[in-house]
A protein has these predicted regions:
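Long, acidic (Asp/Glu-rich), low-complexity accessory segments flanking structured domains
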Residues: 248-266
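A structural signal for short hydrophobic beta-strand segments in well-ordered beta-sheet cores
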Residues: 171-175
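Flexible, small-/acidic-enriched active-site or ligand-binding loops
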Residues: 222-252
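A short core secondary-structure module
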Residues: 180-229
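Glycine-rich phosphate/pyrophosphate-binding beta-alpha loops
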Residues: 162, 189-195, 235, 273-277, ...
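A short, Trp-centered hydrophobic/proline-enriched beta-strand micro-motif
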Residues: 149-158
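Alpha-helical interface subdomain recognition
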Residues: 1-110, 120, 133-138, 145, ...
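Active-site-adjacent elements of ketosynthase-type condensing enzymes
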Residues: 161-169
């Protein structure tokens, strides 16, 4: 297996990129990684700072990313929700979750959660419910356009008064007297890509209180009563994060995703994939912080010697490395289980460990962003210049620690899953 990739120093890249053997990757992964890396270095990295400052991306970038055989790869394995041949989307025929890991990891090298989310996150979290649970009509009408970069999509779960507490969403969808429409009223908040999305995968209340009364609807931006406004957030500036209002929006009943009042199950199914994506991204961002700090520590001189010659700086770098590499191995193990477990089994078995991995990766990201900023000093407090990536990523940290389930909720979920398994074992004894 050939693995040609430039390496300036250890841990700059995952071990399998260079000299270490791995049981997870094939020649297909190596070739795909090279392809994705070339695209990122040509089309993304030279423009990252500009797009982040503008808080938007050129919409033609979606089409470019599809033409490169990359965009459909973020919706999960098998390729395009198992519809690759039918939808005729571009990409490896042997696509698996390690190919998707490569996409998210390589795009993370740009050092901007906003740019990565602005291009990939809406597709990554908003389209899988349509592909996995939607009708054939929705898959073709919406799914194909999004996969080909002709339209954009976002996931609308969070509300002003319901974030991690999904079971208590207030946005309602009531059947019209004629029975042909759902009439949707409510608000959604912190919606990634909402500013420019053409489609919205929306959690609505179609039944009674609690998780049993939730459904998913596909709402289109052109439907009267849909209003979006950009939110001015701490980080991920180019992500198009928005506040969305649905005011008496008439949605055809054919836009129901899956079965009525089954939406909570679909949302939970989607969360594993979303949280795993956060793990991949956050760990690469931690690696970017380490890479930037390592290089700077070799250039910067204080008290007559390079920063890296001070033991306290080397200790910081060592702490960063050990946490990044350990998290990467945990991430690869989960990815392997995603590739080999039946979907029904993995949905339950991986929920707890993926939640804990999200906590691990976001804490490592936060640690590395802080330590890199300490090594850069004042240079990390300025937008642009030598500390550009570190300054930007420090602002992005909270966007990974909170969405998709806060650290506290994720830790509790991990332990509760373990308790369920314990109770199941005890009941058989």
């Amino acid at each position: 297996m050939t693995r040609p990739v430039r390496l300036d120093f250890p841990i700059q890249q995952p071990g399998w990129y260079t000299k270490f053997n791995s049981p997870y990757y094939t020649q297909s992964h190596v070739e795909y990684r090279a392809k994705v890396r070339a695209f990122v270095e040509k089309e993304i990295m030279p423009h990252t700072h500009e797009w982040d400052e503008k808080k938007s991306l050129p919409l033609e970038l979606y089409r470019k990313t599809y033409e490169a055989g990359i965009l459909p790869g973020v919706v999960g394995s098998p390729w395009a929700g198992g519809m690759g041949a039918q939808l005729d989307v571009k990409g490896p025929k042997d696509f698996d979750y390690f190919h998707e890991l490569i996409i998210l990891d390589e795009f993370g090298r740009c050092g901007s959660g906003g740019v990565l989310w602005g291009l990939l996150e809406g597709v990554h979290i908003g389209l899988p419910p349509v592909l996995n649970f939607g009708s054939e009509d929705l898959r073709r009408r919406c799914g194909l356009r999004v996969l080909r970069g002709e339209a954009t999509i976002c996931l609308c779960i969070t509300e002003p008064y319901a974030g991690s507490d999904v079971a208590n969403i207030r946005c309602t969808a009531k059947k019209s007297p004629c029975g042909q429409f759902y009439v949707v009223d409510g608000e959604k908040k912190w919606i990634t890509n909402g500013v420019w999305a053409d489609y919205f995968t929306v959690a609505v209340r179609t039944g009674g209180a609690g998780m049993g009364g939730i459904s998913l609807l596909l709402i289109e931006k052109t439907m009267p009563g849909v209003q979006c406004r950009r939110m001015d957030c701490m980080g991920v500036w180019a992500s198009g994060t928005s506040f969305i209002t649905f005011d008496n929006v008439k949605v055809p009943v054919g836009n129901l995703i899956g079965a009525e009042n089954n939406g909570f199950k679909y949302i939970m199914h989607n969360f594993n994939h979303e949280r795993w994506g956060f793990v991949v991204q956050a760990n690469r961002f931690a690696r970017v912080c380490y890479e930037e700090a390592f290089k700077y520590a070799h250039r910067r001189r204080t008290f007559g010697k390079r920063l890296v010659e001070h033991p306290v700086i080397r200790a910081k770098l060592a702490d960063m490395v050990r946490q990044i590499d350990a998290t990467h191995h945990q991430m690869e193990n989960i990815t392997y289980q995603m590739c080999t477990m039946p979907k029904e089994q993995s949905a339950k078995a991986l929920a707890g460990i993926t939640a804990l991995a999200k906590v691990q990766s976001t804490k490592v990201f936060e640690y590395c962003a802080r330590e890199a900023a300490q090594i850069f000093g004042g240079a990390s407090y300025v937008r642009g210049g030598q500390g550009e990536k570190v300054e930007r990523l420090y602002r992005d940290v909270r966007a990974y620690a909170i969405p998709g389930g806060s650290e506290e909720i994720m830790m509790d979920l991990g332990v509760r899953q373990a308790m369920k398994e314990w109770d199941a074992v005890q009941s058989r004894m």
